Amino acid sequence: MSAHEPHTSLVRPAAKAWHARLELGFERQPGGRTALAHRRHVGPLRVQRALYPEGDAICHAVIVHPPGGVAGGDRLEIDVRLDAGTHAVLTTPGATKWYKSNGLDARQRIDIDVGAHAKLDWLPQNNLFFDAAHASLEFVLALGDGASVLGWDATQLGRQAAGEAWSAGSIASFSKIVGPSGRPLWVERARLDAGDPLRAAPQGLGGFAVYGTLWALGAACTEALAESIAPALPFDDALRAGVTCVAPGTLLIRALAHSMEALQRLLAEQWLALRPIVHGVDPKPLRLWQT
């Protein structure tokens, strides 16, 4: 899992902007198999074939974006539906690169519906924002009765491997997690500009260029669980993390780092530790991460 990218400057003309949409639907078949029963794509978003490294009950799939990056004017939409009793593990093969803007914002919307007693592991690789990238990101997740979810998002500002800082640009983000009754469990709206003083402020990013959030959702996600996790989380000059139970059944781990590798290791470790507790299944590292 690496955020290292070669030094390139890519600005695609607005006339060639991609508008892409991917729909995925999982259903429970006789015998308890989770099947990828619906897939539909428009434009350059795809899903690789379903895999079952953990047996028929858990369907693994990899979402791919062949262009490799997102430029100004691009619009990506991902719609995922899990029927009752299914279990899906979704990831991506590499970082999503957000290129220098051509004067237009790049946009992404992710909409996920997790049915009753369904389980989801949402494990994308990180977002990597090039200098002068302008992006708008929206993420909405709805939970059915008895559903559980483990997922994360991770962001890197600037291409560290190329010696590039994120000195210009903006990121507008909106995240919402909704419970079975339709009541919001967690809502966050933010706008980060490259010149924002909060990037250096201790109550903001504290000078870190890498940050991420892991969310754990389900009946097992209690204040007591958060308190049991907190003592082992790092808090030093290289990596800082904390955990909060923001609502019954809703636990967040948030972290800041100077390198994406350190953040990804932390997120993966916490996901593996939480999986037996939240989903009731064995911890199993993704094969994709081992290639």
Curated annotation (Swiss-Prot):
GO terms for cellular component: cytoplasm. The keyword Cytoplasm applies. It is found in: Cytoplasm. It holds the Pfam family UreD. Keywords: Chaperone, Cytoplasm, Nickel insertion. One of its GO terms (molecular function) is nickel cation binding. HAMAP family: UreD. UreD, UreF and UreG form a complex that acts as a GTP-hydrolysis-dependent molecular chaperone, activating the urease apoprotein by helping to assemble the nickel containing metallocenter of UreC. The UreE protein probably delivers the nickel. Belongs to the UreD family. Required for maturation of urease via the functional incorporation of the urease nickel metallocenter. This is Urease accessory protein UreD.
